[in-house]
């Protein structure tokens, strides 16, 4: 990817889920989120539309975790938040638990807005190769992990086989211009997986290591989600 195209944020994580309503309710009731947008096929939740979000797409279950180890949200007072969960406990600064549909979640103590996205952990074969490929796709390598802005992507060695019912749909990076990403990919002979032109956003999808889909999303002028 051209060095002139630098994503500014890990905007959201999109999942295929078989308990969309139950998971959305859990995230809103226990993890400080609210419904930002909802359609017949997906629900977008987060603490703020301009912070890290989760997109929940309807899919048949059960889903296979495959490449996704867990999704971590940050909070200022880990013990207090964990005490309010139906189950879970903090060990060595992290509390891991499952949401409805077996979605692997975690809480870590950190600065910033409570329940904003902190990091995602993916399990992929050939960790070093995956790190190098994702760095080429716009992530920045910092102390053995990948980062965009103040959010991180961690890669651990493991089997990424998702079977026919993967949990992970895609990871989304916020960019100034999705058109520039598309032009850059075409000039380099990189296959475009998909392009979506929505009322608030324009997005280009590429494939990363082990087929992980990376979305480059541009917020259009007047981006109106809250």
Annotate each PLM feature.
Residues 19, 99, 126, 177, ...:
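Acidic di-acidic motifs
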Residues 21-29, 34-37, 55-59, 63-109:
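Extended, hydrophobic interaction surfaces within ordered domains
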Residues 39, 62-63, 162, 196-199:
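A short beta-turn/loop motif at secondary-structure boundaries
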């Amino acid at each position: 990817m051209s060095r002139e195209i630098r994503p500014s944020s890990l905007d959201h994580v999109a999942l295929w889920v078989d308990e969309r309503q139950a998971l959305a309710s859990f995230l809103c009731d226990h993890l400080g989120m609210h419904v930002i947008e909802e359609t017949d096929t997906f629900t977008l939740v987060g603490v703020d539309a301009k912070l890290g979000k989760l997109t929940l797409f309807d899919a048949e279950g059960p889903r296979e975790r495959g490449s996704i180890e867990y999704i971590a949200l940050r909070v200022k007072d880990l013990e207090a938040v964990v005490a309010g969960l139906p189950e879970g406990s903090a060990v060595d600064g992290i509390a891991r638990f499952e949401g409805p549909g077996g979605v692997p979640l975690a809480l870590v103590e950190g600065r910033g807005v409570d329940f904003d996205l902190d990091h995602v952990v993916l399990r992929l074969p050939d960790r070093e190769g995956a790190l190098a490929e994702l760095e080429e796709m716009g992530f920045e390598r910092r102390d053995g992990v990948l980062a965009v802005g103040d959010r991180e992507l961690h890669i651990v060695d493991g089997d990424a086989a998702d079977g026919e019912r993967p949990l992970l749909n895609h990871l989304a990076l916020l960019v100034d211009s999705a058109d520039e990403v598309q032009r850059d990919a075409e000039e380099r002979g990189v296959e475009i997986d998909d392009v979506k032109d929505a009322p608030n956003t324009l997005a280009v999808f590429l494939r990363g290591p082990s087929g992980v889909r990376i979305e480059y999303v541009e917020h259009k002028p007047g981006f109106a989600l809250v």
